[in-house]
Structures are given as C-alpha cells and as structure tokens.
A protein has these predicted regions:
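TRNA-recognition modules of translation machinery and tRNA-sensing kinases, especially anticodon-binding
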Residues: 1-170
Length: 170
C-alpha cells in the first residue's frame, strides 16, 4: 500500500520551512547560493513538501510513501571520534516512510511505521532495541519519536539505524 518515490534532491527555503524547523538542520545542510536551494538532509522533507499547498480530501487519505534518495550533510566529524566513518559522512542513501493521514489516525499509523521498521530488522536477524526518545531530544516538529538502535559487535555498542516520528499537524 506504499508508493515508491524518488524525491527531489534539492528544496527551496520556503518548502523547507514548511516541513521542519530549519534551525534543526541549517547548520548541517549544504546551501546552493545564490539560488536559495538546499541539498536534502533527509528524504522525508521533500516527500512531505511534495504535498505543499495541496488540498487533500479525507477520502483520499491515507497517502503512504516510501522514499529512497541520497542525502547530504556537512556534519562529518562534528560528533566526536567515535562517530567517524559510515555514521558521519557527507553523502548517504536513506529509505524513509511517510504517511499523510487524518489527525485522529496518526497514532495508529505511527505504530504501523514502527512495525514496518521492526519487521525489516527482524527479517535480517539482527539484534536491535527500540528507544522511546524523550521530548527534550526530539526537536520541535515531532510529537513522539522512537529510534531503533542496532547492536554492532565490532563497536561493542548500539547505534541508531531508524527513527520513527509522529509529526501530528506540524
């Protein structure tokens, strides 16, 4: 029931301001001057922005999308030596799930998104844990956020591999 989407890799400032608190990402995003565009930091931003200024009839909901795209961030090395390498690189590919739904259905779909992520990791046979992120760490956009952290035996620690947020009416 999901539509596969290859989202745009650039967004203008107006579109970005409509889908996130730009201050959460602006310091790690690549800006393209003088055009006022940004390379995307994560693919759920353009997936959501694609619906900007659209009037969606309730009968057409939910809209379920999966986006696959390269993402770009300037945060390499910004989080200390233990986060170098694959975890903090300038370009990486992500798969994102986005559901646009009726407000009263958002919590059920949030559970569905989390279940999809857990099913994927279960199918890989990898050990992970689900972390319920405290409100002080989820930023202004999300109402609730879960992370899946996979156990990396070589590193001897869990690392975040999935985030699953309910942004309610942001």
């Amino acid at each position: 029931g999901y539509t596969l989407v290859q989202p745009p890799l650039m967004m203008n400032r107006k579109a970005y301001e409509g889908v996130t608190d730009l201050s959460d990402f602006e310091t790690v995003m690549y800006g393209i001057e003088p055009d006022g565009y940004y390379l995307i930091a994560t693919s759920e931003h353009p997936l959501t922005a694609m619906m900007m200024d659209e009037v969606i009839e309730p009968a057409n909901l939910p809209i379920k999308m999966v986006g696959v795209s390269p993402c770009f961030r300037r945060e390499v090395g910004a989080h200390g030596m233990s986060d170098r390498g694959i975890w903090r690189v300038h370009q990486f590919t992500k798969v994102e799930q986005v559901i646009i739904c009726k407000p009263e259905e958002s919590w059920g779909y949030h559970t569905e998104l989390l279940g999809n992520a857990k099913d994927l990791w279960d199918s890989l046979g990898l050990h992970y844990r689900v972390v319920d992120i405290c409100t002080g760490d989820i930023g202004t956009v999300a109402s609730r956020k879960y992370d899946l952290e996979a156990w990396l035996p070589g590193a001897g620690e869990f690392k975040e591999v999935v985030s699953c947020s309910n942004c309610t009416d942001y």
